[in-house]
């Protein structure tokens, strides 16, 4: 075998998955079709959950370096730092239930550089874990592993591993070659976007609906939304001529575009793999689900796929997984992906032209002025409302949810954050000094988890918690006697057999 896990795709999802695998003791090998990393901006930011996940891996400073500039750019481009639902920019971060849990505005190429450096640091300074110019063209699997035929600049080669994960985007070769069902809905709109400083752009109207479509403008960028006229071959590059024609159809203004870059074309077609695992092949990110970019949820969704899968797959391939652990990947992440497809379809419907839809948009806009409605949409788009079903009774409000970056007081009186204790990538039990029974219950698993005796600040409802490697609260206790029966069930569910 050439690796423990072959990861196909060196975008943000593939790089983070490889890093999580390596941190948990597995040997990943990343295959990327492109010879060089993409330089053009695509996604513009990551959500609170992904931001917290990367902070737990020590990447907080790298993210913060991009955040201040990103906030300024967003305010400049949209006139507001608020989030949106179907381009209704009213979701106010300051009004949310947990206003300190925020995302990071970082362009995708910058994020890829951060993650590539992180992966390199985990592989002893070597970049050999990523093979560029390697395109998967055939795939077979049996009970022992997966073998791929790869096209390279030097000809074809065969590589094998016990498991393979497709992180190769919405047109995933892995998904097609492995035979995943990919049901969904056809597109109702197409977005075209280019980066350009063409002098004629000032002749265009301001951003908004034009009667025949939508126009979106920002310094150095212009985009259109049309509700018909899909290109016959969506795989062809977006040219200046196609963009010029689209601008004319949408605005009636003919703008010469002597030079464009960063051309993107995408639709609101929404599809999701029926399962995220077929035998020894798994999917993550856009390979598992595609949808419109409304709400900026796609990259966050994919990164959290990687965070959920990495430790589970590493435990499986290294023989440390409890029974059924890998099956929980689809069980937990598929409903989250389905929920994103659901809300992006709703946003697509609200963007359609016509008086009836315009009336509905006005009503949704009015509803967003109500605090609880604003928070509902904020939870939905951020993913902070996500709660996994746990295979044992767990009644604490945090159980099954992503743990916030708690502030903790140590025995010496110092203050630390939860993320500072999670760098090892192992499960973590934090317990109050007055709940030693929690640490005693975990004693048989001490070789497989980290334990810290701390006091949680600013939360009267939380004294102790078991945190999975992906940041999910597997068990939590309030200030009363710790429920060690449920804690033991949680340890058995997620950690190697004691």
Language model features with spans:
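Core beta-strand elements of the Rossmann-like FAD/NAD(P) dinucleotide-binding domain
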Residues: 2-3, 154-163
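Conserved mid-domain beta->alpha element of the FAD-binding
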Residues: 10-19, 31, 115, 166, ...
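Glycine-rich FAD pyrophosphate-binding loop
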Residues: 20-43
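Active-site-adjacent segment of FAD-dependent monooxygenases/related oxidoreductases
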Residues: 39-118
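Conserved FAD-binding catalytic core of PHBH/FMO-like flavoproteins
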Residues: 117, 163, 167-268
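A conserved beta-strand/loop element that lines the FAD pocket in flavoprotein oxidoreductases
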Residues: 122-136
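A conserved short coil-to-beta-strand element within the FAD-binding core of flavoproteins
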Residues: 132-146
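C-terminal helical "tail/cap" subdomain of flavin- and related membrane-associated enzymes
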Residues: 315-410, 416-427, 432-437, 444, ...
């Amino acid at each position: 075998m050439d690796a423990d896990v072959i990861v196909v795709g060196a975008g943000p999802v593939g790089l983070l998955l490889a890093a999580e695998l390596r941190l948990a003791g597995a040997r990943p090998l990343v295959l990327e079709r492109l010879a060089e990393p993409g330089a053009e901006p695509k996604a513009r930011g990551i959500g609170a959950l992904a931001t917290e996940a990367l902070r737990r891996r020590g990447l907080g400073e790298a993210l913060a370096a991009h955040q201040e500039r990103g906030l300024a750019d967003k305010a400049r481009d949209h006139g507001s730092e608020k989030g949106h639902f179907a381009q209704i920019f009213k979701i106010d971060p300051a009004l949310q239930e947990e206003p300190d849990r925020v995302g990071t505005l970082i362009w995708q190429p910058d994020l890829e550089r951060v993650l590539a450096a992180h992966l390199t640091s985990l592989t002893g300074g070597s970049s050999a874990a990523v093979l560029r110019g390697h395109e998967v063209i055939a795939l077979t699997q049996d009970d022992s592993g997966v073998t791929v035929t790869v096209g390279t600049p030097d000809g074809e080669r065969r590589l094998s591993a016990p498991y393979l994960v497709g992180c190769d985007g919405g047109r995933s070769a892995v998904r097609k070659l492995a035979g995943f069902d990919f049901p969904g809905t056809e597109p109702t709109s197409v977005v075209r976007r280019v980066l350009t400083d063409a002098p004629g752009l000032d002749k265009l109207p301001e951003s908004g609906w034009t009667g025949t479509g939508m126009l979106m403008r920002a310094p150095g960028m212009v985009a259109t939304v049309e509700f018909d006229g899909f290109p016959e071959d969506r795989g062809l590059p977006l040219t200046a001529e196609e963009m010029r024609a689209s601008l004319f159809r949408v605005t009636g203004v003919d703008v010469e575009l002597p030079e464009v870059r960063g051309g993107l074309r995408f639709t609101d077609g929404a599809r999701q793999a029926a399962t995220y695992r077929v035998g020894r092949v798994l999917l993550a990110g856009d390979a598992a689900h595609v949808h419109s970019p409304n709400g900026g949820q796609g990259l966050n969704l994919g990164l959290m796929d990687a965070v959920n899968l990495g430790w589970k797959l590493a435990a499986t391939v290294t023989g440390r997984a409890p029974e059924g652990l890998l099956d929980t990947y689809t069980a937990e992440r598929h409903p989250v992906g389905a929920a994103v497809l659901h809300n992006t379809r709703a946003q697509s419907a609200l963007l359609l032209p016509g008086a009836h839809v315009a009336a509905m948009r006005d009503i949704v806009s009015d509803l967003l002025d109500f605090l609880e409605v604003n928070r509902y949409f904020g939870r939905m788009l951020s993913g902070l409302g996500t709660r996994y079903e746990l295979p044992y009774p767990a009644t604490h409000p945090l159980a099954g949810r992503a743990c916030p970056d708690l502030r903790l007081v140590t025995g010496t009186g110092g203050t630390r954050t939860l993320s500072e204790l999670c760098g090892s990538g192992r499960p973590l039990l934090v317990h109050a000094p007055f709940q030693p029974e929690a640490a005693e219950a975990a004693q048989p698993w001490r070789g497989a988890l980290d334990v810290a005796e701390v006091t949680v600040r600013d939360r009267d409802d939380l004294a102790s918690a078991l945190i999975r490697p992906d940041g999910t609260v597997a068990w939590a206790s309030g200030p009363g006697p710790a429920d060690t029966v449920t804690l033991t069930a949680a340890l058995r569910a997620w950690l190697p057999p004691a």
